[in-house]
């Protein structure tokens, strides 16, 4: 894999989530991007079981268990403000056995799914973020395949993002700053999706105006 940027696209004013997704995908197709299947990234939140916290009033910690269709044999466990563990798909079964330590948060499942597009050396994924039956937002993932060091290709990624996101082009992901000259890996992409999902969850708690 190459270096990837994951961002959220605001819903266009007067449009639905699905209509905004269609506007984005049409822009990509006009650029010459070709459809290459579909993708899905999902996340379920677990919190520390009350029985493990003791009586000192400790705050429980969160763990995010995630899957990415690009890595069908892997499961990603991201600890709050901590490391990312990459395990095989049986990790989900293990979580059931660890219910005395981690418990699934109620109605915590969130996912994004949509279409993959290939444009030259760029792989683009535009997805609809859903919680339960409701569409909650739009995710945009762009991967530049030939490079594995973020600092070597961010300017190129940024230029491509600007070509179809315009004024909604994101800044450099925080994970780039932490690993400026390090080799980029799948865990870095999952951290970005975790941040995006948490942002979408928080936005559901306050009214958000549409964009022009």
From Swiss-Prot:
GO terms for cellular component: core mediator complex; mediator complex; nucleus; ubiquitin ligase complex. The keyword Cell inner membrane does not apply. Component of the Mediator complex, a coactivator involved in the regulated transcription of nearly all RNA polymerase II-dependent genes. Mediator functions as a bridge to convey information from gene-specific regulatory proteins to the basal RNA polymerase II transcription machinery. Mediator is recruited to promoters by direct interactions with regulatory proteins and serves as a scaffold for the assembly of a functional preinitiation complex with RNA polymerase II and the general transcription factors. It comes from the Eukaryota. PANTHER family: MEDIATOR OF RNA POLYMERASE II TRANSCRIPTION SUBUNIT 20 (PTHR12465:SF0), UBIQUITIN SPECIFIC PROTEASE HOMOLOG 49 (PTHR12465). This is Mediator of RNA polymerase II transcription subunit 20. The gene is Med20. It comes from Rattus norvegicus. Component of the Mediator complex, which is composed of MED1, MED4, MED6, MED7, MED8, MED9, MED10, MED11, MED12, MED13, MED13L, MED14, MED15, MED16, MED17, MED18, MED19, MED20, MED21, MED22, MED23, MED24, MED25, MED26, MED27, MED29, MED30, MED31, CCNC, CDK8 and CDC2L6/CDK11. The MED12, MED13, CCNC and CDK8 subunits form a distinct module termed the CDK8 module. Mediator containing the CDK8 module is less active than Mediator lacking this module in supporting transcriptional activation. The lineage of its organism: Eukaryota, Metazoa, Chordata, Craniata, Vertebrata. Belongs to the Mediator complex subunit 20 family.
